[in-house]
């Protein structure tokens, strides 16, 4: 499966990445019809596809087993281009062969900073002045604000462009928050 769009058609947000959680049930009846050689080839094809996706710039893919009867296997895909995410989703769905993986549910979201981040002014007033007793515009106060700003720059970047570890277990829950 190849891209049928140009770089000009990419859907890349101003900040952050697209995130897709994909959950599949394995049709064990369909899987059992395949010979051992066909099953091995299908597993090899899926492994190669995962490696190919993981080697794509600005893209991460986590794969995991689901511990409930709602699904058997899942993927968490983070990437900058929505068209690329859509292509990867289609490729993953058919990677083991037609009708082997049945989507049970999926979620599309984006990484974001959130509306609850402390501003330098709030940090200065609430922490530096009230808690630590520092006076505004002193060297110690300004150094602390500079450190806070460096920390928040890294924090913001990590939220928008996370580096997800390939952990054997993670918790997922869908967010029901309405966005404006």
Feature map (PLM): residue ranges:
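Long compositionally biased, domain-poor regions of proteins
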Residues: 9, 45-61, 78, 82-84, ...
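A short linear-motif detector with a strong N-terminal bias
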Residues: 1-3, 42, 52-56, 83-87, ...
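An N-terminus-focused feature that recognizes amino-terminal "leader" regions
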Residues: 2-65
């Amino acid at each position: 499966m190849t891209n049928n769009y140009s770089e000009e058609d990419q859907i890349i947000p101003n900040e952050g990445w697209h995130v897709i959680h994909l959950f599949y049930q394995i049709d064990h009846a369909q899987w059992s019809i395949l010979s051992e050689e066909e099953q091995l080839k299908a597993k090899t094809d899926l492994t190669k596809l995962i490696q190919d996706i993981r080697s794509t710039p600005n893209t991460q893919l986590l794969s995991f087993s689901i511990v409930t009867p709602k699904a058997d296997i899942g993927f968490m895909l983070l990437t900058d281009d929505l068209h690329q995410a859509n292509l990867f989703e289609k490729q993953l769905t058919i990677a083991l062969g037609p009708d082997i993986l049945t989507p049970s549910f999926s979620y599309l979201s984006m990484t974001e900073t959130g509306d609850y981040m402390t501003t330098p002014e709030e940090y200065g007033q609430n922490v530096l002045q009230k808690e630590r007793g520092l006076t505004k515009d002193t060297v110690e106060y300004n150094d602390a604000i500079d450190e806070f700003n460096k920390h928040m720059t890294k924090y913001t970047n990590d939220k928008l462009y996370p580096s997800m570890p390939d952990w054997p277990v993670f918790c997922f829950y869908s967010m029901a928050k309405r966005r404006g």
